[in-house]
Amino acid sequence: PSKSIKVCQNRTFEKALFTKLGIPTPKYHIVDSADSLESAVKDLGCPVVVKTTTEGYDGKGQFVIQTEDQCPTAWSTIGNRELIVESFVNFKRELSIIAVRKENDDMAVYPMAENDHLNGILRFSTAPATNISEEINNLANTYIKELMHELGHVGILTLELFETDDGLTANEMAPRVHNSGHWSIEGTACSQF
């Protein structure tokens, strides 16, 4: 598979790429046993979000640990495989930015969307997102462009971000058209499709 698909299919690779490029992420640990899960939770402090490193989507393969005594339940529910344990992010809102790149390096970036979820499922996106500071907009544009270049990505790429009091924190990315960009069908002259 392409480098983009390989990275996006594994949260361990994805977080490593974000870190390499200086894109902030939640603090995290990779674990592969019930004991290492408990150690990670103790180190990070509760609450944490535990996710499968592969095959998770729309809230599937995730468990929020509120207290340390929930570790065995989390492990029995989604464990017995490699997991990523992330510090819980107190965010103001989730944003996504979508960019498309040609082989000759021409690139277009769509306006950011604000995403509203219910039970881990995107319910609607508002685009363009309102009240985006110039600093936040510039950061998001820089991050998506750096990812495109580092991956040598040709096509469309979406980056999901949490806006916090400290700026932006990367959640995940997708090397495909994205549900947060469906607004572009009627909302732009050239949709993400």
Protein language model features and the residues they cover:
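Short beta->alpha transition motifs characteristic of CBS
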Residues: A113-D116, M173-V177
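A short beta-strand motif that forms the metal-chelation/ATP-contact edge
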Residues: A99, G167-R176
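Acidic/polar active-site rim loop that often engages polyanionic ligands
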Residues: L17-I23, K51-G59, L118-P128
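Internal nucleotide-binding/catalytic subdomain
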Residues: I65-L159, E163-D165
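Conserved N-proximal alpha/beta basic substrate-recognition cap immediately N-terminal to
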Residues: P1-L44, E55-G56
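A short, glycine/Asx- and small/polar-enriched loop/turn
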Residues: L44-G45, T164-T169
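Glycine-rich phosphate/pyrophosphate-binding beta-alpha loops
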Residues: A174-A189
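Internal helical hairpin/lid segments
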Residues: S191-F193
